[in-house]
Amino acid sequence: MQISVNEFLTPRHIDVQVVSPTRAKITLEPLERGFGHTLGNALRRILLSSMPGCAVVEAEIDGVLHEYSAIEGVQEDVIEILLNLKGLAIKLHGRDEVTLTLSKKGSGVVTAADIQLDHDVEIVNPDHVIANLASNGALNMKLVVARGRGYEPADSRQSDEDESRSIGRLQLDSSFSPVRRIAYVVENARVEQRTNLDKLVIDLETNGTLDPEEAIRRAATILQQQLAAFVDLKGDSEPVVVEQEDEIDPILLRPVDDLELTVRSANCLKAENIYYIGDLIQRTEVELLKTPNLGKKSLTEIKDVLASRGLSLGMRLDNWPPASLKKDDKATA
């Protein structure tokens, strides 16, 4: 199979192998040599750092003033409880932040199912253990759940309002990403006689709030959106190209006097040897502002008059001035 050096193979086969409800293996092939690592590493970084999700960012526990406390009748200390709260897989439908409550007493296991939920809040892992209570134990707490992206340490959420925050409101370092683990390998692939191609295999596991296949789709969309700016890359000062036909637009051959500019503006243009509209539209704003006695007010007037005729400054004309105009100039001379 002969392929031009300017052409690249594009993946023609994608396979999704569902290992569990929260884990999947995605295979993409064939890829040009080296593109397996290029795409795999880019997607891996986006999945780990840029996927939005929800997490507990603050907890307030009755009888607890700081995270180094212990609660009577509770097997875990406060630090262990906070670590367990980080394992909650929560989905918010419609809101960016909510406050939830948990209240339980007596011997038994405290799980995510004991949290009192609002109508637009969902906990995907209700069996997740938060603490274990003895017969004389009780656990009452308020949890603030927020939507975010990536990893956010507690220090980054501190503000001037922290001084007025009541004692006992414990801030948590939060990992919002629904992706728990991702790894990729690049294997060999073959298409007809070409054996030096790549096959990308991504092994992805989430916390259940996001389907693995949907996570890959979102990561690819983010990457596509970020690279789109390079696809449409253009220079800031690129002149506008005027489509040329067999004959030049007659309006470009008319003298600038036909624009009915003020005497000041017209004299400034003639002083710069700008006699025809075709000469004028090829000048830029910067060039005109360098003209003696031509200020921003005159420049605005010129731009408005040209715009009324469908023209603008900074346009480019091929084969200007035309031969007929040169002959007229010589005859006048």
Curated annotation (Swiss-Prot):
The keyword Manganese does not apply. One of its GO terms (cellular component) is DNA-directed RNA polymerase complex. It catalyses: RNA(n) + a ribonucleoside 5'-triphosphate = RNA(n+1) + diphosphate. Its EC number is 2.7.7.6. Residues 1-234 are annotated as: Alpha N-terminal domain (alpha-NTD). Residues 248-333 are annotated as: Alpha C-terminal domain (alpha-CTD). NCBIfam families: PRK05182.1-2, PRK05182.2-5, rpoA. This is DNA-directed RNA polymerase subunit alpha. The lineage of its organism: Bacteria, Pseudomonadati, Pseudomonadota, Gammaproteobacteria, Pseudomonadales. The gene is rpoA.
